[in-house]
């Protein structure tokens, strides 16, 4: 049960079949003594991703649940309608063709809008969500995740020579990507957080997820760098293209073997 402080709780679940109550459920807190929180606290930042340091959800966070059934149709609560992207790939990757207007008619870059408004995003995956195509998988899903980078192409922000099947999240901050239950699985695809010049991205959390059959990275954290032949100040780097990913917390995930049916690259 995400979003609870450490303590003891009674839980009641009511369904069409009846009601069941479980008492004295103990909730333990995560260890938040690592560098993601240590460095954040030094800069006056509290709470990594969509959660506060006590484990509760930030009061203004937007939460979206993603399943295999709704992976290409879901929209963020409060951000629905034809002007907003639909599907988790198009929501997170503004370079996807269905989000940036190449074929989708032009959508609002919702991730950057949330960043500008100071609204955290919590993406909760339920069950197995499958991605991939005939180039990367021996058993691709009936419908690939729209918005994934293309295989060996620049489609949806991809790179020639890459195996693709990545959601590339640009210029964002305060995002939690998490699994609900012990079977939340990203099968055949991965997520990459990317900073760009002038947009230092910070505050990312990946937790309670299984990754399997990933043809590229399962999780990627990619900043930009600046090069100088002589020592420079921190301010120089920040004004000359240096944009790191800051305060990233990757924990309690399981990484299974990756797979690509027909690798487009040799590394």
Predicted segments, located by residue:
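Extracellular "leader-to-stem" segments immediately downstream of a signal peptide or signal-anchor
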Residues: 1-124, 128-163
